[in-house]
């Protein structure tokens, strides 16, 4: 974040806006970016400036607005130019100063803007300065964190709830009844609070749950009683931010815990693909509670000799081909870029049959306004495509030539199979796959020292390239592969394969990893052991290569 420093594309009122500034006090919610409200996202898109004291909000703004130079300026509301922490009054001056520049200011605040005193104080400063403002509530941690911990605040038998911001002047005697209590800022004084509640008449065995960094993949919950919560919280090293629930509703957590029990909860999973390629895979991993870390191992580059591709595209337009076969999304992208270079569009495919390997490739074709005539009914591979490919028939097929835009490292199996079926093939290098640059040093260190819980390999080349640019994953890391060929390559590099997808599909691969994680978790629970992640345990000896499926 900047400290009064303007980033490119921001810092001045956008074209088409008036010069009257406005402040939107926006709650970011309790931590999960998915809980950001629709109105909050709209305002972030429209903002000229975002003022926040929360470092993690920079990632949130980038996720909502995209990593573009035209995005809003981020102004540090936590520290001044002298490096000293800002008071509420000083932060209010920062907000007002930005609005007086005629900018649309989003004051992005953790949780809900009016849950704590800072929001109202800064809004009052806007009133005094004559600055228009609005309040956009965030999903409150009061309700969200217990919900993510599997604890309802009310039931048919417990309908009263009290929310208490803990401090030195709380009269705990007024909370001696059986109503549910939600305690904020209680971590440091939970022992004194519990003792005061017991002294006021609460039963020592009253259930208590304390949840730290709720709604995030670092969430952790300790369940205890008023009598033991101080000891148990200390043993679990609980620290702020945390929300504490006191009352019988805590007893429902065993049955209703849904977030922390996800099969890959908190797992840091290495995804050796580009962000563009990893979208679906990473999204599915997040659904199972994992934290994907995308590390490109392959860089896609244009062919060294573009003449071959130019000639093939001209031949396509002139009607030299009966079929075009796309074996990857990258192949679709390469042909589409060449079309745009020549000023062509999808009409050039008129009369041409289109084949695609894999649903994602077919979807990429569909985004072009085209529909694949042939997608393998079985295995999504060159072999699967050959099984369904028709033999050349002189009566039915006026042209016997196939255009294959592929990578420079593609195998000859598809070409040989098509020739056996009577077709002639133009096997054209549409793009090159080259080894990507090594990841940053912290990532390489995490790979080698076992800080990743799992790595997901989607091809043999990702295995070879990851080992080449970053080193071999630590023996404690779970290795998941998309199929037998990738498993063989992993084993050749001294890795033990723990999970293999039953079919060559990235979503099925993630499901298989989740099944592995669920079985691992269940085994720990049944053995009475604490549930840990693979990175929490380091074996004393390196694992030997060999497949466990």
Question: How does the language model describe each region?
Answer:
Residues 1-136, 176, 242, 319-334, ...:
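Class I S-adenosyl-L-methionine
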Residues 2-19, 139, 151, 279-286, ...:
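Short, charged N-terminal beta->alpha structural module
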Residues 3, 14, 21, 110-178, ...:
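Class I SAM-dependent methyltransferase SAM-binding "motif I" and its flanking Rossmann-like core
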Residues 22, 104, 180, 207, ...:
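Residues that mark the start of a beta-strand
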Residues 27, 75-78, 105-109, 209-213, ...:
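Short beta-strands and strand-loop turn motifs
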Residues 48-51, 74, 152, 181-182, ...:
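Short, well-ordered beta-strand core segments
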Residues 57-58, 69, 135-146, 159-172, ...:
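Conserved beta-alpha
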Residues 170-210:
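Conserved anion/nucleotide-ligand pocket segment
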